[in-house]
């Protein structure tokens, strides 16, 4: 399957702001895709200030299907980053991005500062949950990868 880097950035997305960073996510990001796997995208956007201060602020997470995407507004991204969310931490360490504004590199340069005890707890919790799924005969991936 050929990857279209900005295929997920469609009109139906209603992103009221500008894209800061995006990457392929899921099985394709780890080269574990199967022949029928779909391509997932994730990213970070910065909402327009007038929208943030308005009566109808934009969503903190935008999602969609065909193609599958999940994109966080930068405040939500930072909240998840400070909680040590593994998928969010991974964004700072990947070299496999498909869109990246220069401002992203400032955050990326500080990425080691976000590797805290909380991140270790999050990764260990995820690993334990995956082992429990295996013990109960459930797949570790819900769809799309090996």
Kindly label every feature range from the protein language model.
Residues 2-8, 57-64, 75:
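A near-ubiquitous, low-amplitude feature marking generic local secondary-structure context
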Residues 26-28, 50-53, 72-75:
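Flexible, active-site-adjacent loop/turn segments at secondary-structure boundaries
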């Amino acid at each position: 399957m050929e990857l279209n880097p900005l295929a997920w950035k469609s009109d139906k997305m209603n992103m009221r702001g500008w894209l800061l960073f995006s990457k392929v996510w899921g099985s394709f990001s780890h080269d574990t895709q199967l022949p029928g796997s779909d391509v997932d995208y994730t990213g970070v956007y910065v909402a327009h200030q007038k929208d943030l201060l308005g009566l109808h602020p934009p969503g903190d997470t935008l999602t969609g299907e065909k193609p599958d995407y999940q994109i966080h507004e930068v405040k939500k991204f930072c909240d998840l980053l400070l909680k040590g969310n593994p998928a969010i931490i991974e964004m700072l360490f990947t070299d496999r991005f498909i869109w990246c504004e220069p401002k992203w590199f400032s955050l990326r340069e500080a990425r080691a500062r976000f590797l805290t005890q909380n991140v270790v707890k999050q990764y260990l919790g995820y690993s334990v949950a995956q082992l429990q799924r295996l013990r109960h005969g459930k797949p570790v991936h819900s769809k799309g990868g090996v």
